[in-house]
Amino acid sequence: MLAIISPAKTLDFESAVKNFPVSQPHFTDYSEQLIEVCRKLSPQDLSSLMSISDKLAGLNAARFAEWTKIHNENNSRPALFAFKGDVYTGLDADSLSEDDVIFAQSHLRMLSGLYGLLKPLDLMQPYRLEMGTKLANPKGKDLYAFWGNVITQAVQQAIDEQGDNVLVNLASDEYYKSVKESQINAKIIKPVFLDNKNGKYKVISFYAKKARGLMCRYIIQHHLTEIEQLKEFDLGGYWFDSASSTETEFVFKRDINE
């Protein structure tokens, strides 16, 4: 079983990280090409392209300038502990055991606009480059054109290494679009998280993001290997609703206590 999630805009390169055997990101040749494109953009260009403040644009221009293909523990940190934000709040990597993190290294991948696909312990440097960014590059008009089949093939390879042909899609639509589903040889399960608010069950973005992280945590902590085991997910007060689910879309519901 392989789970995929989105990265996060919020990063943490300050707090202490447990000592794990780190790995190298696989697609730094590609990352370097994107960095070269981004370095040609002024902070004003970045502000417009990414719809961010002048302050954030300046920060990210500096990050692009400082980025280097060489990743070590002085300039980088493992992706699992670098990303913060709603999904990663639910995942809560800092509280995972060593065995859990080792399991995650084989069973979890993070999609990335700059790095393509990251294993949890792959080193990464601070950056902001969302997959949906319309960054013109030598391969096309956006990052989907840039990455082409590269991410899809890497995801398939990771699935093949599991041996059970199961992909759990916990990524946002923006990031999952970088995976060409028609080319994936696996049973793809998409968990959907609905919260009851004012008498109706619906997707509430903040809660859904955190729930995707909770599901990752559940898979990792319980070392899941079977599709049916996903239905037992109960973190955060969610429960599996078989009546609303299909063979490939697993619906989990929760009643919010106001």
Swiss-Prot record:
It holds the Pfam family H2O2_YaaD. One of its GO terms (biological process) is response to hydroperoxide. It comes from the Bacteria. One of its GO terms (cellular component) is cytosol. InterPro entries: YaaA (IPR005583). Belongs to the UPF0246 family. NCBIfam families: PRK02101.1-1 (NF002541), PRK02101.1-3 (NF002542). This is UPF0246 protein HI_0984. It comes from Haemophilus influenzae (strain ATCC 51907 / DSM 11121 / KW20 / Rd). The lineage of its organism: Bacteria, Pseudomonadati, Pseudomonadota, Gammaproteobacteria, Pasteurellales.
